[in-house]
């Protein structure tokens, strides 16, 4: 699987990327500080250009970013996010209903809330740790 990973200052990217690679997936990273998690035309264009240049099976992020969800929806690429913060204000956006989304949250109450709101692709998934590194 070819994965495009948006990296920001989250603490758990190293372990997640390492696990993807150990499972045989290829991972490309994109990093950019975002001033707005909902709309950033320049960053959206950059992601689209990467997707047009190379096939990606999914885009992965730690925490949820509406602008990435909307870009994936437009490009027909799966968007997988795994939350590590709660409350995660960025999830309270209409884009959580996009069909491209596969949202995993470590907070069961958060999962139940969004499931009840009608978000189709949301699951409860506790946070993980690299037990070999500890």
Stretches with model-predicted labels:
Residues 128:
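Carbohydrate-associated surface elements
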Residues 1-3:
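Extreme N-terminal starter segment of soluble prokaryotic enzymes
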Residues 119-124:
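A short alpha->loop->secondary-structure connector
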Residues 9-19, 23, 28-115, 133:
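Extended catalytic core of nucleotide-activated donor transferases of GT-like folds
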């Amino acid at each position: 699987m070819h994965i495009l990973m948006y990296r920001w200052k989250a603490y758990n990217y190293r372990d997640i990327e390492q696990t993807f690679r150990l499972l045989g997936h290829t991972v490309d990273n994109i990093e950019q500080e975002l001033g707005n998690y909902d709309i950033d035309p320049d960053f959206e264009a950059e992601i689209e250009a990467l997707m047009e240049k190379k096939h990606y099976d999914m885009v992965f992020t730690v925490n949820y970013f509406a602008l990435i969800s909307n870009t994936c929806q437009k490009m027909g690429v799966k968007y997988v996010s795994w939350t590590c913060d709660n409350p995660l204000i960025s999830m309270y956006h209409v884009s959580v209903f996009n069909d491209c989304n596969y949202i995993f949250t470590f907070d069961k109450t958060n999962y139940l809330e969004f499931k009840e709101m009608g978000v189709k692709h949301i699951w409860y998934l506790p946070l993980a740790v690299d037990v070999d590194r500890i």
